[in-house]
Regions:
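Extended polysaccharide-engagement surfaces of secreted carbohydrate-active enzymes
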Residues: 30, 37-428
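Active-site lining segments of carbohydrate-active enzymes
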Residues: 1-48
Length: 428
């Protein structure tokens, strides 16, 4: 049956270890194992009831595959394992196995598998799954395009032929992140801001990837990624508590610690809707940081507009200790040690370990990466280049009162298209 708290929920979102999106980790393993059982017992007296079988089918077709791009699974559905590159082999193998059964949607699963093989033809498969792949009838198969939102996880996806954008939102129905530390190590300690509006961009050509390219299956997150400045998030920099390491205590039965994680939100307002395009929004009341913000995303074929309003500190006077509230725009690993930003007027070459302030700019375009940011009104933007990773953000100060922002991120666009887009923004 569909879960009421964890597992596959009624909207096909997979939640685990509380209300944490996990379709790309535990959910993928669950789908792979159950698919094998369905295949083995198909057509026998022990066949799985179709009403139960559809739970796995819906998880794969209506949720998990929306978070696949460039051979990896979006980190937003990997729970505490976000620092390891998600490999989509388990998802593909589940689809290939179910396509061999009498499932009513087996043709859809075959088509989905073909789409994955076309999108990432170099994927490694087991011998059995490779045989199933060879046996697929030639036909059309594409990765999903458009917008989807899953309210039980406050998580959404927007897909276009050249890019994927996953995002999370925060409410009293979901938890922020999971940190788990044991004597043998831990994961997830830096996940404070994952639910605070993080817009995770995956380009289908692999550019801008946050993960090392040394292994198809197990690439690790680049060491220079700043987890306090996740794109799309608004946060008080330095305002989150550091999670403690595991310490053995013979008086306690538990052998692990979850630190300061697994906090439910305090706002009831969050949601999203759409099909070809989409819109989503929420009121951010973070677990730590003492501020609030109203945030929304508006998706269209070139990318998305991010809007923020009523960003205000809730800290007592002087209590914030001058830690600034900031909204991060992008964090982009560059293929060039000295990347160039093209501006409306002129250009700026960045140097390693440098931070600069661009005053009142209308837009910038990252040369050779084809990524652009356009502001509705001229904005003062902070730019940092460290470990070949370009980060940009807006600073609202330590005590904001009704601060806001409006910018568009265009993940795959030429310089000429950027200039034309900036000349006719959709807002007045």
């Amino acid at each position: 049956r569909y879960g009421t708290e964890q597992g596959v929920r009624e909207d096909y979102c997979f939640l685990f270890h509380g209300n944490i999106p996990y379709a790309g980790s535990y959910g993928a393993g669950f789908a792979q194992t159950v698919s094998e059982f369905i295949y083995v017992f198909d057509g026998t007296p022990y066949a799985i009831d179709p009403a139960h079988q559809e739970i796995v089918t819906n998880l794969l077709l209506e949720h998990t595959r929306w978070f696949l791009a460039a051979g990896q699974i979006d980190m937003l559905v990997r729970g505490r394992g976000y620092k390891s590159k998600g490999y989509w082999g388990a998802v593909l193998e589940s689809l290939l196995v179910l396509a061999q059964t009498s499932d009513a949607r087996k043709n859809e699963m075959a088509s989905a598998a073909i789409g994955m093989l076309k999108a990432f033809p170099g994927i490694n498969l087991s011998l059995t799954s490779a045989g199933f792949a060879d046996g697929l009838k030639p036909g059309s198969g594409e990765m999903p395009i458009g917008f989807r939102y899953w309210p039980t996880g406050e998580i959404g996806a927007y897909n276009q032929p050249s890019f994927h954008i996953g995002f999370r939102q925060y409410s009293d129905r979901v938890q922020d992140y999971e940190y788990l530390n044991r004597a043998d190590g831990g994961e997830g300690e830096d996940g404070w801001n994952l639910a605070y509006g993080f817009t995770n961009i995956l380009r289908k050509d692999g550019k801008g990837s946050w993960y090392s390219k040394d292994d198809q299956r197990t690439g690790s997150m680049l060491s220079g990624i700043d987890m306090e400045r996740l794109p799309g998030t608004t946060s008080r920099i330095g305002g989150n508590p550091g999670n403690p390491k595991f310490q053995y205590d013979p008086s306690k039965p538990t052998m692990s610690t979850t630190g300061y994680s697994l906090n439910f939100g305090r706002s009831k307002l969050a949601g999203g809707a759409g099909e070809d395009g989409g819109v989503a929004g929420f009121v951010l009341k973070p677990a730590y940081g003492e501020f609030t913000a109203r945030k929304s995303l508006h998706f269209f074929p070139k990318g998305f507009w991010a809007l923020g309003s009523d960003i205000r500190s809730t800290a007592a006077a002087g209590a914030s200790n001058k830690k600034p509230v900031q909204t991060t725009i992008i964090q982009w690993p560059c293929g060039n040690e000295r990347p160039t930003l093209i501006l409306q007027k002129g250009s700026v070459q960045l140097f390693p370990d440098s931070t600069l302030t661009l005053q009142k700019i209308k837009w910038f375009w990252l040369e050779k990466e084809n990524v652009a940011v356009v502001f509705n009104e001229p904005a003062t933007v902070f730019i940092r280049l460290k470990n070949n990773i370009l980060s940009s953000w807006l600073d609202h100060g330590p005590d904001p009162l009704q601060a806001g922002y409006a910018y568009a991120v265009l993940p795959g666009i030429s310089l000429e298209e950027t200039s034309l887009f900036a000349d006719e923004p959709p807002f007045v």
